[in-house]
């Protein structure tokens, strides 16, 4: 039986650092919201079988997304944190039978709307059949400094350091177990949850274009990248 690839996009955050009058995933760039651009990446990819977006129960913007993508599942069962939102989404996928424990879940940041299709293909091809799963990541290029107040306290050896990106691909059953803990403090991505089970996910070469919209100035770069597609 073919293993399904299911994109899960947690979109329950408010994007406080972005400083807009709405969550950053609903900021419009061109004629579409950031979230619509992100969903389109997965909907256009032939290896992705289903896309699920998990939003806050209080979300008032999601209806537009559902109208634009009627085939996408938009669920209002997001949690207080990213980890809780992903946990709720994976649990519902398993409960409804839309995913089996052996299917792949590709968790992707709603605010990474410039993911190149070739990077997504690379992740699926290299990690899709790996029991330990894998994530997109790029080697750290800049020199890193530790700070003590406003002063440098140390320079960090960067040889073995990678910057994690998304999607992060794991079997549904593994991800469900990894996020089952009552206390998810310190879990900043799916890989960190899986690592707590002793699993060592694969590092798959990511792409510098796969940036996360975080600060207002990021919108300028994102707009240029989207215009170049």
UniProtKB/Swiss-Prot annotation:
Catalytic activity, as annotated: 2-C-methyl-D-erythritol 4-phosphate + CTP + H(+) = 4-CDP-2-C-methyl-D-erythritol + diphosphate
Gene Ontology terms for molecular function: 2-C-methyl-D-erythritol 4-phosphate cytidylyltransferase activity
Top enzyme class: transferase
Stored InterPro entries: IspD, IspD/TarI, IspD/TarI_cytidylyltransf_bact, ISPD_synthase_CS, Nucleotide-diphossugar_trans
Site, Transition state stabilizer: residue positions: 17, 24
Record Pfam families: IspD
BP terms from Gene Ontology: isopentenyl diphosphate biosynthetic process, methylerythritol 4-phosphate pathway
Residue(s) at site: Positions MEP for the nucleophilic attack: 158, 212
Keywords: Isoprene biosynthesis, Nucleotidyltransferase, Transferase
Entry EC number(s): 2.7.7.60
Pathway listed: Isoprenoid biosynthesis; isopentenyl diphosphate biosynthesis via DXP pathway; isopentenyl diphosphate from 1-deoxy-D-xylulose 5-phosphate: step 2/6
Assigned protein family: Belongs to the IspD/TarI cytidylyltransferase family. IspD subfamily.
Function noted in UniProt: Catalyzes the formation of 4-diphosphocytidyl-2-C-methyl-D-erythritol from CTP and 2-C-methyl-D-erythritol 4-phosphate (MEP).
Name of the protein: 2-C-methyl-D-erythritol 4-phosphate cytidylyltransferase
Source species of the chain: Neisseria meningitidis serogroup B (strain ATCC BAA-335 / MC58)
Phylogenetic placement of the source organism: Bacteria, Pseudomonadati, Pseudomonadota, Betaproteobacteria, Neisseriales
Gene name, Swiss-Prot/TrEMBL: ispD
């Amino acid at each position: 039986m073919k293993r399904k690839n299911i994109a899960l996009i947690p979109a329950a955050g408010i994007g406080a650092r972005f400083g807009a009058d709405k969550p950053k995933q609903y900021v419009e760039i061109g004629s579409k919201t950031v979230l619509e651009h992100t969903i389109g990446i997965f909907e256009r990819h032939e290896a992705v079988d289903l896309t699920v977006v998990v939003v806050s129960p209080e979300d008032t913007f999601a209806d537009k997304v559902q109208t634009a993508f009627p085939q996408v599942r938009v669920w209002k069962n997001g949690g207080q944190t990213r980890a809780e939102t992903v946990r709720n989404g994976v649990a519902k996928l398993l409960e409804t039978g839309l995913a089996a424990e052996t299917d792949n879940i590709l968790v992707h940041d709603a605010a990474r709307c410039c993911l190149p299709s070739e990077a997504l293909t690379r992740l699926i091809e290299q990690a899709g059949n790996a029991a330990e799963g894998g994530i997109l990541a790029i080697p750290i290029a800049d020199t890193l400094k530790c700070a003590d107040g406003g002063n440098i306290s140390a320079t960090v050896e960067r040889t073995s350091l990678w910057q994690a990106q998304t999607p992060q691909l794991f079997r549904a059953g593994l991800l469900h177990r990894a996020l089952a803990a009552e206390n998810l403090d310190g879990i900043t991505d799916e890989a960190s949850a899986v690592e707590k089970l002793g699993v060592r996910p694969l590092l798959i070469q990511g792409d510098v274009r796969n940036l996360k919209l975080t600060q207002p100035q990021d919108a300028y770069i994102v707009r240029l990248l989207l215009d170049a597609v």
